Amino acid sequence: MSATKRSTAAVMTALLVACFAFQLNASMLSPALERMAKELKTTDDVIGLTQTVFFTSAALFSLFLPRLGDMIGRRKLLTGMMALTAVGCVLSALAGMTGSVALLFVGRVIQGVAGPTVPVCLIMLRVAVPDPKRYGTLLGVITAVNGGIAGVDALAGGWLAQNFGFGSVFWTMAVIAVLAAVAVAFLTDESLVPGDHRMDWSGTIALVVAVGALLTIFNELAKLSNANFWLVAGLFWLAALSAVAFWIQEERTSQPLVATVYLRSRSTWALLLTTTLTMTGVFAVMNGLVPGLAQNTGYGPGLGTDVVSFWTLTPYAIAGLLMGPVSGTLAGRFGYRKVLRVGLLGTVLGLGAILAISPSATPVLLLAVNVFVGITYAGMSNIMLNGLGVVLSPNDNPGYLPGLNAGAFNLGAGISFAILPAVSVALGSGLDGFQGAVITGLVLLALAFASSLLIPAPAVEKETAA
C-alpha cells in the first residue's frame, strides 16, 4: 500500500483517463473501417472481423482480470493493462505501415486486454471513496464516460483516418493509453484483498472457453442464412462441456475463481440475467435498428449517412453522459435497485415510443426518443447494472462479479445483434420487420425488469436504511 493516500481528485483523474483510453479503443475506429479496408487492400468483412476479435478478446479478459487484480494489486493490474493496450495500438498502427492484416488482428487481440477497465476502475474508486453517496455520484461520472464522449471520439476517429490514414487513429490511442498507464501508476493507491491467494487458472480456462464459444455462436448466428450451423452445433457442445468442467473445478478447488455458493446466490445469477436481458433487448435497437429506420427512404425519413448520427447516436450518447452523474447521485440516496427499475421501465416506454412513431418517423421525433432512451438506458439502467456488480460483490472476492457482469454485457450485445435482426428479416425487410424486432426488444426488457426484482439489496443499501 502507498504511504501517502492520493486525493479523490487525483484518483478520479487517473481513472477517467483510463476509461477514456478504453473507450477510444472501442469506438474511435467505427467511422474508419471503410478506410482501413482500402488501405490494407482487403474486404469490409475482414475488417469487421477485426472488430469482432477485439470485442471478444475484451469480453474474455473481463472474466478473470478483475479477480487477478484482487490478488496482485489493482493499480499494478490497471497500469499493466494500459501499457499492454498501448503495445497493441502500436502493432495495429504498424499494420497500416506494413499493409499486414495479420498484424492488425494481433494488435486488436492485445488491445482487448483493456476490456475490464471500467469494472477495475469502479472497484478502485470504491476503495478510495468509502462514502456511499459520494461513490454513487463518481461512479456515474466514470460509467457515463464509458458510454462515449458524446460521439466526439467517433468523429475524431473519422477525421484522423480521412486526413492522415487509419494508422493515425491507433497512434492516438497509443498515446492516450500511455498517459493512462502513467496516471494510474502515479495518481492512485494500491489496493488488494489481504491474505494468501492463488489464481484458479484451471477454472479460468474453462470459463473463458465456455464464454468464448457462446460469443462465437452468436457472432456466427448474426450472419443469418450464411451462418455455419455445423460450427454453431459444435461450439454449443464445447460451451456446455466447458461450463460443466468449470462448475466441477469450482466445487473441488480450495481457492476457486468463483465459489459455487456465490454462483447460486441471487446476487450473482439475478444480476447477470438482468444485464444479459437488458442488453439483448436494447442494444441492437438503439445501435442498429433505429439508425437504420432513420436512413430508410421507404418508411423512414431517409437521412443520409453523413447526418444520421447527429439525430440518433450522438444525442443518445450526450443524454447518457449528462444523466450518468445524476443517476449515480440518486443511487446513493435511494438505492441502486430503485434507480435501475425506473430506468428499465423508462426504457420500455422509450421502445414503445419508437414503435409508435415508426410509421411516420421524422428527424425531430427520432431525436426525442433517442434522448429519452439515452437518459433511461445509457444514463440510468446501464450505470446501475455496472454499479450493482461492484456493491453486490463479497469482501473476500470483490473482483469476480464485476468481471462476470462485464461478460454479461458483451454476451447480451452479441445475442441482441443475432436475435433482433433475425426477427426483422423473418418478418420482412419493411416496417413489419422493424416493428417485430422492436416488440421483441420490448418483451426482453420486460423480462429484464422482472428479473431485476430478484436482485437482493446490496449491503450498502441495508446500512443506509439502518
Predicted features along the sequence, with ranges:
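Extracellular/periplasmic helix-loop-helix junction of adjacent transmembrane segments
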Residues: 30-61, 100-105, 306-311
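Paired small-residue
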Residues: 88-91, 99-111, 364-372
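Conserved MFS/SLC helix-loop-helix module at the cytosolic interface between two early adjacent transmembrane helices
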Residues: 60-99
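Cytoplasmic helix-loop-helix junction between adjacent transmembrane helices
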Residues: 110-144
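Hydrophobic transmembrane-helix bundles of small-molecule transporters
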Residues: 162-274
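Central cavity-lining transmembrane alpha-helices of secondary-active solute carriers
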Residues: 52-67, 119-123, 314-326
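12-transmembrane solute porter fold
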Residues: 8-22, 29-30, 44, 88, ...
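Membrane-interface helix termini in secondary transporters
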Residues: 35, 63-67, 71, 159, ...
